A protein has these predicted regions:
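Flexible N-terminal pre-Rossmann segment of NAD(P)-dependent oxidoreductases
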Residues: 1-10
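Active-site region of the double-stranded beta-helix
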Residues: 17-65, 78-118
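Short beta-strand-centered segments at strand-helix junctions
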Residues: 71-74
Length: 118
């Protein structure tokens, strides 16, 4: 598993892909996502060891436009995936500069990546 260094990054790009291969979590704070202009898929997995994604526990939810999702500290997740469009505006609520001091990101090997089939 490749561990990414996101020091200095403050956001991410949301595209039209439906492949799940990146997971992140924060130890010290919750994260909130507000879907502004469309439905989205969001994947989550329960907290666990920092060096291992619990693939057997990953769940994907379809979240309607206008819904606020709150993720507790330690929950594996990543940005939302578009449902019916190629792009999606999402308000992400996190403490300032969080990615510099509290963001663990892992990328799954190709064989362990999931694909959303709608």
């Amino acid at each position: 598993m490749e561990k990414l260094n996101l020091h200095g990054k403050t956001g991410f790009i949301i595209g039209g892909t439906r492949g799940i291969g990146t997971y992140k979590y924060h130890n010290t704070c919750a994260e909130a996502m507000l879907l502004l202009d469309g439905d989205a898929y969001i994947h989550v997995a329960p907290a666990g060891p920092a060096d291992r994604i619990p693939y057997d526990a990953v769940e994907v939810f379809r979240v309607p436009k206008g819904t606020m999702v709150t993720l507790r500290p330690g929950v594996w997740h990543h940005g939302p995936f578009c449902v019916d469009t190629d792009s999606l505006q999402t308000l992400i609520i996190l403490p300032e500069r969080l990615y510099a001091y509290d963001c663990t990101v892992l990328t799954a090997p190709e064989a362990d990546k999931l694909r959303i089939e709608a």
